[in-house]
Amino acid sequence: MPAWLLAVAEPVTEATEGSAEKGILDAILESNLINIAIILSLLYILGRRVVGEALAKRREGILEELRQAEQRKQEAIERLAEEQQKLAQAQQEAERIRKQAEANAEARRQELLQQAEREIERLRANAERDLSAEQEQILQELRRQIVRQALSKVEQELPQHLNEQVHQRLIERGIQMIAR
């Protein structure tokens, strides 16, 4: 029997020795104390094993949860690293696409500028050609009008001042001027 149980039971037995009535009660009390001591001892012995096993299981469960949490943490760190790598690659790809788009835009801008310059040059050449043709046409029309007016005036004044031979030469000159 454990020492603490004997220490509790001893004062109770000393106090009950003086009376006979108390003898029965003391015996019951003593037997109850012994029974309680036995039950407590059994509970301690058996309970220690059960509680120890329960605590060991609980500790194993906690350790397993910690291992799983650590594993999930490592997996999360690995996934994070992978996602960061993917993000970096996506950013590099986006930068490459942006630079390519800028280069394409610049090339297209240069192409459009060159095309516009060629179109301006073509329009300028057409305008100069049209202007030259129009100027030539106007000059020819002016020459014709001048020749007509001159001939008309000469025809009015010439018969009075010239003879037939001079008249014929003037007509030929007028025809030559018109032919130019």
UniProtKB/Swiss-Prot annotation:
Localization: Cellular thylakoid membrane
Entry-linked Pfam families: ATP-synt_B (PF00430)
Gene Ontology annotations for the cellular component aspect, listed alphabetically: plasma membrane-derived thylakoid membrane; proton-transporting ATP synthase complex
Record key words, sorted: ATP synthesis, CF(0), Hydrogen ion transport, Ion transport, Membrane, Thylakoid, Transmembrane, Transmembrane helix, Transport
UniProt subunit comment: F-type ATPases have 2 components, F(1) - the catalytic core - and F(0) - the membrane proton channel. F(1) has five subunits: alpha(3), beta(3), gamma(1), delta(1), epsilon(1). F(0) has four main subunits: a(1), b(1), b'(1) and c(10-14). The alpha and beta chains form an alternating ring which encloses part of the gamma chain. F(1) is attached to F(0) by a central stalk formed by the gamma and epsilon chains, while a peripheral stalk is formed by the delta, b and b' chains.
Task of the protein: F(1)F(0) ATP synthase produces ATP from ADP in the presence of a proton or sodium gradient. F-type ATPases consist of two structural domains, F(1) containing the extramembraneous catalytic core and F(0) containing the membrane proton channel, linked together by a central stalk and a peripheral stalk. During catalysis, ATP synthesis in the catalytic domain of F(1) is coupled via a rotary mechanism of the central stalk subunits to proton translocation. Component of the F(0) channel, it forms part of the peripheral stalk, linking F(1) to F(0).
Full protein name: ATP synthase subunit b
Organism of origin: Synechococcus sp. (strain JA-3-3Ab)
